[in-house]
Amino acid sequence: MASPSQASLLLQKQLKDLCKNPVDGFSAGLLDETNLFEWSVTIIGPPDTLYEGGFFNAIMSFPSDYPNSPPTVRFTSEVWHPNVYADGKVCISILHPPGDDPNGYELASERWSPVHTVESIVLSIISMLSSPNDESPANVEAAKEWRERRDDFKKKVSRCVRRSQEML
């Protein structure tokens, strides 16, 4: 098990790497300069998607045994999406700990692995925005709209994008 100091060192390194070599599509930094385990992330809505032009804020919370266990990611901006719970928590395979999948939706290779970094997590979230998974939704209503009433879904996402721009 990773000690908090190992987790701190790894998070410090990942933060330094992201500051030195920023990645298109998002920015990340500490929520509070004294706590390496809480990050503030802004994801820019990916081009050629319904989320294009949006600026979506999230908090990434790391456990003390990171990277052995995954962080949680919760949008603080409103995001209407099949894979985002009503409280903003992101539901994607790589954030699920290894082990049994009671619903049988995921391969073990799709779940959390200590090789993932802040960058790979956020890039997976950007990919999720581009390609919703409506097979195992966190937000059943959004998934139903995505499948059955795409125009209504698009209107709600447009409203989220507009609100995210107004918050700048």
Regions found by a protein language model. Give the residues of each.
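Residue-level recognition of well-ordered beta-strand positions that form the cores
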Residues: 42, 59-61, 74, 93
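N-terminal onset of structured domains
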Residues: 2, 19-56, 64-66
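Amphipathic repeat-derived elements
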Residues: 50-68, 153, 160-161, 165
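Domain-scale recognition of soluble eukaryotic interaction modules
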Residues: 2-22, 70-168
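Hydrophobic residues positioned within well-ordered beta-strands of beta-sheet architectures
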Residues: 39, 56-58, 71, 123
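Non-catalytic surface loops within mature trypsin-like serine protease
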Residues: 45, 62-64, 77, 96
